[in-house]
Amino acid sequence: MAVISMKQLLEAGVHFGHQTRRWNPKMAEYIFTERNGIYIIDLQKTVKKVDDAYFFIREIAMNGQDVLFVGTKKQAQDSIREEAERSGQFFVNNRWLGGMLTNFKTITKRINRLHQLNAMETDGTFEVLPKKEVSKLKKEMADLEKNLGGIKNMKKLPGAMFVVDPRKERNAILEAKRLGIPVVAIVDTNCDPDEVDFVIPGNDDAIRAVKLIAAKMADAVIEGRQGEQLAETPVETAEVAEEAQVAVEAAE
């Protein structure tokens, strides 16, 4: 039994890697073939890796720990926010601020400032202040919300981090590694898998591909918290082999 099917991966375009001239040799084991100058990712391995990541994230959630969803590239921003919110988790989808994890105490002070400004807006304080000052405070509040809104209720460091594109989010990964926080990530053919604890080989540039994988990680959290089996799909060996061939033919 697998939590994701080859058909789902194919339909979302998870198998399309980067151009062959833009690759990391460490990803060779996850590459099935090359077609028209583009690497095709081995989806049989992706199915297995999604399983591994899913059960790990589910275990984290069962233990009462949180998962931080991170994806600041345009293709990932909406999915990261939507799936984190759906599963009651935290997210960073605009910009990774240095020290978000390693200097969490200082970040918490900025979050407290955001809460303070929200309270001022709600309790009517803004109404009695000069318009110029209110305008300045609202801009400050908007900037804080944009960068910290996804973690404003995070009281402690997460138990794991789910990342889209380790190359772009390298600072986030380095902070997580420094603190011993396990990293699950969608890793495309141009990335270094050695920096990730749970590699999910796949296309990190297609919105549908990112949405599919992020949704599975959110499902894992929900299942871990609720004890519900949300998504199990039987995958037969023959079917996997057949669909892998379809992926190659589709790329031609």
UniProtKB/Swiss-Prot annotation:
GO terms for biological process: translation. It comes from the Bacteria. One of its GO terms (cellular component) is cytosolic small ribosomal subunit. It holds the Pfam family Ribosomal_S2. InterPro entries: Ribosomal_uS2, Ribosomal_uS2_bac/mit/plastid, Ribosomal_uS2_CS, Ribosomal_uS2_flav_dom_sf. The keyword Ribonucleoprotein applies. Keywords: Ribonucleoprotein, Ribosomal protein. GO terms for molecular function: structural constituent of ribosome. HAMAP family: Ribosomal_uS2_B (MF_00291_B). NCBIfam families: rpsB_bact. Belongs to the universal ribosomal protein uS2 family. PANTHER family: 30S RIBOSOMAL PROTEIN S2 PROKARYOTIC AND ORGANELLAR, SMALL RIBOSOMAL SUBUNIT PROTEIN US2M. This is Small ribosomal subunit protein uS2. The lineage of its organism: Bacteria, Bacillati, Bacillota, Clostridia, Eubacteriales. The gene is rpsB.
